[in-house]
Amino acid sequence: MLTYETWEENVVSFSEEDETKGALSVLNWAYEEYKDEIVYACSFGVEGMVLLHLINQVNPSAKVVFLDTNVHFQETYELIQRVRERFPSLNIIEKQPELTLDEQAKLHGEKLWESNPNLCCKIRKILPLEKSLVVEKAWISGLRREQSETRKHTKFINQDHRFQSIKVCPLIHWTWKEVWRYVYKHSLPYNPLHDVGYPSIGCEKCTLPVGDGGDSRDGRWAGKMKTECGLHYQ
C-alpha cells in the first residue's frame, strides 16, 4: 500500500483518454488500494457533485466527510440533503469543530473570520479534517489545476505534508466547462449560488460573488490576501 511514509513519485500511472480524463481510473485504483481507509472530503461545490457521481459508481458505500463549520450558506445545507436523497448508499458524515461559535467567540473574540481568518479556518476546518484522517490512509479532493495558481501543479496522487497522508485528486485535468457539462448531462443537483456569481462556495462569512473574468477563488476571503483555507498545503 502506498502511504505517506512509503511515498514514491510516479509509482502508478493512469490513462487519461476516457470521458472522465482519468478520474474513474484514479478512483478505481484508490478504492482498490485503500479499501475502507480512504475518505472523500467534500465541500459540496460543483466539482463535488461530479466526484460524488463518479465515486458512487466505483464504491456506493464510500465515506464522505463534510466539514461543517456551522457558518455555511443555507443553500449548502439544503444541497447536502438533496445529495443524500440522490445517493442514499454513500456514507456522508458531517464533521463538527470542537468549539461552538459561542465558545470560539469567548476564547478569540467575536467574528474571528474577520480578525484572524487563518485561525478561524484552522479551528473550524483544518483540525476537524485532521481528526477525521487519523484513521485513514488517504483522502480524496476535488482540486483542479485550472482553479488557481496555487493548484496548477497538483497531481493525481500527492504526498500530503499538511496531514501526512496521501491525497488523491481525480479531477486535475477537468476544465470548468467540462465540470458543468458533466453536471448537466447527468442531471446532478448543485448549489444554486453557482447561478448567481459564486464559482467557489465556502463559509457564508467569507465568500462573495465574483465578477466576470475573475479568478474562480477571488470571492474567497476577499480583501484578506488569502485564497486557501489551509487544507491544501503546497
From Swiss-Prot:
SUPFAM superfamilies this protein is in?
Answer: Adenine nucleotide alpha hydrolases-like (SSF52402)
Keywords noted in UniProt: Cytoplasm, Iron, Iron-sulfur, Metal-binding, Oxidoreductase
Swiss-Prot/TrEMBL GO biological process terms? cysteine biosynthetic process; hydrogen sulfide biosynthetic process; sulfate assimilation, phosphoadenylyl sulfate reduction by phosphoadenylyl-sulfate reductase (thioredoxin)
Q: What is its main location?
A: cytoplasm
* Swiss-Prot/TrEMBL catalytic activity: [thioredoxin]-disulfide + sulfite + AMP + 2 H(+) = adenosine 5'-phosphosulfate + [thioredoxin]-dithiol
Q: How is the cofactor bound?
A: Binds 1 [4Fe-4S] cluster per subunit.
UniProt-listed CDD domains? PAPS_reductase
Pathway membership: Sulfur metabolism; hydrogen sulfide biosynthesis; sulfite from sulfate
The positions flagged as active site in the entry are 229 (nucleophile)
Which residues bind [4Fe-4S] cluster per the record?
120-121, 203, 206
**This protein's record includes keyword 4Fe-4S:** no
Location in the cell: Cytoplasm
**What EC identifiers does the entry list?**
1.8.4.10
What's the domain of life for this entry?
A: Bacteria
Gene Ontology CC annotations of this record:
cytoplasm
Function according to Swiss-Prot or TrEMBL: Catalyzes the formation of sulfite from adenosine 5'-phosphosulfate (APS) using thioredoxin as an electron donor.
By sequence similarity, the record places it as follows:
Belongs to the PAPS reductase family. CysH subfamily.
Instruction: Please give the name of this protein.
Output: Adenosine 5'-phosphosulfate reductase
Protein's gene: cysH
